[in-house]
């Protein structure tokens, strides 16, 4: 189940990958049976792909699975897919990728990935036909409606989906519904952010006490990994390990994996609820009828709830939304440079309280 995500590798003072330390992580994982290695064009400013190619060259190519992702941020009318893809092959020192993903299919990237003039999917399907891509999939941090729309239109070409799933986002970001959507389509799921960028590895004292009462031998991160690993349709659980301590703890969890009991599932659900100082919105949408500003109030409260929990969450996990609404409903999430103009604040204030 365990896969290595090469996005948070140990680094040196200048920010480049500490290849000696990172190489030891790869070797330890490989020698203990981990055979799925995930990278992307942009990880570590492009150095991650190069590092993995170097670190894995000593091992038989058919003894591990290599996954990477398209550089979606570079795609424009002048984009050269041939040059970008061949660069990835060179970086990774391979002539094929076992798994290749459209990187972060979401609301803001959907127009690019589906633009018929850019022919992104057409090129990747050609590479698959040539044997340079074994399995084609997507990763996504997008919202459920977008994922439903994309899979309905393009799902016939997709063989697997990589989703952000953890016991907090199971309800907070509708990970449960996304999981069920992909499962119902008969596609396997690869999990990313099982510890939500590390936030589920550092819990409050009371939550840790409850965990230790049930399983004193387990670390706090182990609970997060066991949650996603217990889901029947999860094929790989990615972990962005950056230290040998994390590697050893994960190997302990997965080499003798135990699915969550009902009691343990209930505990994680309680902990997730306790972590969210949120507005208990059920998305009934009755309030929207009375909103003079025609705001999507449930959606904005969802943004607020997520930002309230993770005010410093990494950019890749942010829910994209118009800056002024984020600033209005989650002050402090963005810098003061994005504060509302006075006229905008007054315009919003004129519509307040009617709902």
Residue ranges and their predicted role:
Residues 1-64, 123, 129:
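N-terminal binding-site loop/beta-alpha segment at the start of enzyme catalytic domains
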Residues 7-20, 69-80, 108-113, 142, ...:
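Active-site mouth loops of central-metabolism enzymes
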Residues 16-29, 77-93, 142-152, 220-227:
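Short, acidic/polar
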Residues 31, 53-63, 86-95, 128, ...:
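Acidic (Asp/Glu)-rich catalytic clusters
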Residues 38-39, 68, 191:
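Hydrophobic residues in well-ordered beta-strands that form the structural core
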Residues 45, 105-282, 286-295, 299-302, ...:
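Beta/alpha (TIM)-barrel catalytic core signal, keyed to glycine-rich beta->alpha loops juxtaposed to Asp/Glu
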Residues 62-74, 100-103, 163:
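A short, structured active-site edge motif that brings together acidic residues
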Residues 89-112:
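Active-site groove signature of glycoside hydrolases
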């Amino acid at each position: 189940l365990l896969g290595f995500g090469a996005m948070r590798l140990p680094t040196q003072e200048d920010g480049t990958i500490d290849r000696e330390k990172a190489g030891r992580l790869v070797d330890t994982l490989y020698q203990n049976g981990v055979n799925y290695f995930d990278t992307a064009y942009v990880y570590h400013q492009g150095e991650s792909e190069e590092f993995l190619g170097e670190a894995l060259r000593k091992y038989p190519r058919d003894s591990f699975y290599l996954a990477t992702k398209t550089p979606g941020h570079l795609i424009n009318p002048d984009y050269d897919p041939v040059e970008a893809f061949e660069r990835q092959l060179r970086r990774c020192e391979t002539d094929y990728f076992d798994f290749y993903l459209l990187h972060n299919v979401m609301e803001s990237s959907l127009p690019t990935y589906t633009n018929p003039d850019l022919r992104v999917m057409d090129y990747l399907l050609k590479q698959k036909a040539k044997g340079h891509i074994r399995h084609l999939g997507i990763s996504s941090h997008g919202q459920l409606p977008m994922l439903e729309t994309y899979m309905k239109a393009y799902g016939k070409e997709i063989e697997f989906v990589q989703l952000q799933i953890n016991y907090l986002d199971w309800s907070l970001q509708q990970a449960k519904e996304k999981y069920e959507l992909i499962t119902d389509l008969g596609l396997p799921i690869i999990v990313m952010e099982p510890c939500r960028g590390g936030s589920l590895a550092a819990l409050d004292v009371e939550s840790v006490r409850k965990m230790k009462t049930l399983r004193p031998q387990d670390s706090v991160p182990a609970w997060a990994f066991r949650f996603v690993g217990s889901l029947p349709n999860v094929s790989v659980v990615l972990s962005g390990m950056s230290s040998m301590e994390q590697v050893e703890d994960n190997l302990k969890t997965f080499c003798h994996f135990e699915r969550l009991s009902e009691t343990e599932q209930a505990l994680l659900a309680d902990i997730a609820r306790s972590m969210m100082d949120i507005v208990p919105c059920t998305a009934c949408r009755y309030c929207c009828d009375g909103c003079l500003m025609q705001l999507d109030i449930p959606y904005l409260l969802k943004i607020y709830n997520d930002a309230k929990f993770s005010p410093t969450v990494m950019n890749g996990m942010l829910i994209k939304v118009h800056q002024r609404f984020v600033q209005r409903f989650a002050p402090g999430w963005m810098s003061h440079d994005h504060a509302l103009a006075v006229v905008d604040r007054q315009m919003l204030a004129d519509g307040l309280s009617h709902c």
